[in-house]
Amino acid sequence: MEATITLSLAWIRSVGNTQELVFASDSRLRAGQAWDVAPKIFTLPRSDALISFAGATDYAYPLVVQMSQAIGFFPASRDRRNDISVAKGIALKVFNEMRENIHDLPRGQMTAGDPGVRFIFGGYQWRQKRFRIWELHYDASIDRFTFRPVQPWHGGNSGRVLAMIGDATDEARDRLVELLRSRGKLPGNGFDMEPFEVLRDMIRDRSHPAIGGAPQLGKVYSYMRSQLFAVAWPDATGVPHALGRAALGFERFDLPLLDPDAPHLHSRHAAAASDDDEEFVTTELADEPYEDD
């Protein structure tokens, strides 16, 4: 299978005195064709973290599934008694052990080589009471998966923490800088939903064949809960999409619904007496992140 690229982001969002960790991705897979319904953000058995990927899906999906199961099989990690840094270590051990089990290689190939996939892993680190983001990647110099902590931006932007992996990351970063500058936010402290807006616009302008489909979104809150979101696509009047897939005619996703052109707002179905009740309640994130009560 040819390498499958994407654009996947994770950043710490700051609104007033509140922070939350946001993951966003496109939904396209390419392998001689385009398929725009592929999950790229994954919840885990522990509720304080998310993981996303960019790269070859023949590696990515087995690695994520087995890593998730390994966390679920380990009560101290599943119950969050161990910090997410321990979960990150579990992920790397699983990735490397699985890669070592690749065999029956093509003639003349001695090792499995570069898997062509990268991951963003992040969540709330309760021991240090802060959000953390790591990039998990293959390092050819040691022939293993390893990690890199995502560091804050420099130049008066120390509160801005952002991970980008996949296709056209340089362009995405340039667009983000220009967007922040146009709003008078450079230098500044923290992101709102600007990285999502950049992803949305790059999907819409169709300038990159590897980036497409409805945006995906997930969040981790400081009370150690993760939440996936549905996104109305291609705009607020469109069908809700969850992890890239459009809701079927009979479906009503039990997820907050995001307007891609007002991503600081989201709606959810109100508590209803029956499944036929389609009333929505709109909530704006002000000083507190969205909480499903």
Language-model regions, residue ranges each:
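N-terminal nucleophile
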Residues: 1-293
